[in-house]
Regions:
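Alpha-helical interaction elements
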Residues: 156-160
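Transmembrane beta-barrel domains of Gram-negative outer membranes and organellar outer membranes
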Residues: 24-143, 148-153, 163-167, 186, ...
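Glycine-rich phosphate-binding "P-loop"
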Residues: 161-181
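Cleavable N-terminal export/targeting peptides
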Residues: 1-29
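Generic helix N-cap/helix-start motif at coil->alpha-helix transitions
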Residues: 205-206
Length: 250
């Protein structure tokens, strides 16, 4: 997972039959969701370039999300209290009703690592993501809180919940789906080289879904993720998609 590179991710989601686009931008993630306790280290910048696309699909099921460019940095010089802030650029994110481009999203996350509160304590993180710049279009303003713990021979497990703008977090049928739970897991297959990760978010909305994939750490400060992502509401996000995610710390 992105826990070693603790990155920013945002994913464009769309409802093709309505000609509408929406998006969400997140802080450090596991795979598809923010189900992770990690926070970007102080003074370390992170660049993420993420793509999602269908595989061997014919129209109208074929499609791809616009490429996401995300930048994040840790801003607190403390070991036990950490904070990251990030921005994502999603071009072109056009509101079909007005023709306006609303590509920028902000996010932040506070956290404290495992063992910082007392011996054996879980890591804890909380923050907001998909802080959009256009009211009633991109301001999902989703709050999330997570707790995570390393378990020998199993890996790390992260559990938490999210809640956002009830006017935007809805199903494809218009039902309010503003809250849900998230769970994530990651484990090294080969230390500092290959890692497997999986996650899931509940809710028939733009957030709901998950998947599992493989991280290849091809350099000390860089990784590539590949794997499938599945969605709870195909009416919002379309068919399942393959993701490739490049992450670089500097």
């Amino acid at each position: 997972m992105k826990k070693r590179l603790t990155r920013v991710i945002s994913t464009v989601l769309f409802t093709g039959m309505l000609g509408v686009t929406s998006a969400y931008a997140t802080p450090s993630t596991t795979y598809w969701t923010t189900a992770v306790i990690d926070v970007q280290p102080y003074g370390v910048w992170h660049l993420g370039i993420d793509n999602y696309f269908t595989v061997l699909k014919d129209t109208p099921d074929a499609g791809a999300f616009p490429t996401d460019l995300g930048l994040t940095v840790g801003v607190l010089p403390y070991e036990k209290i950490q904070l990251e802030v990030g921005v994502d650029l999603l071009e072109t994110l056009i509101d079909s009703s007005t023709g306006e481009d609303n590509p920028l999203f902000l996010n932040f996350k506070f956290g404290t690592p495992e063992g910082s509160l007392f011996p054996g304590s879980p890591g804890i993180a909380a923050g907001m993501w998909n802080i959009g710049t256009k009211s009633d279009v991109t301001n999902y303003n989703i709050f999330h809180a997570m707790a995570g713990k390393s378990i020998p021979q199993i890996g790390r497990i992260h559990i938490g919940a999210y809640s956002g703008n009830k006017d935007l977090l809805k199903s494809s049928t218009g039902k309010e789906e503003a809250t849900g739970f998230m769970i994530g897991w990651d484990r090294w297959l080969v230390k500092d080289k290959f890692m497997i990760a999986a996650d899931y978010a509940s809710g028939d909305n733009a957030v709901g879904g998950g998947g599992a994939g493989l991280y290849w750490f091809f350099a000390p400060n860089a990784s590539m993720l590949m794997g499938p992502v599945f969605f709870n509401d195909d009416g919002i996000n379309g068919e399942w998609k393959w993701t490739t995610q490049l992450d670089v710390n500097f």
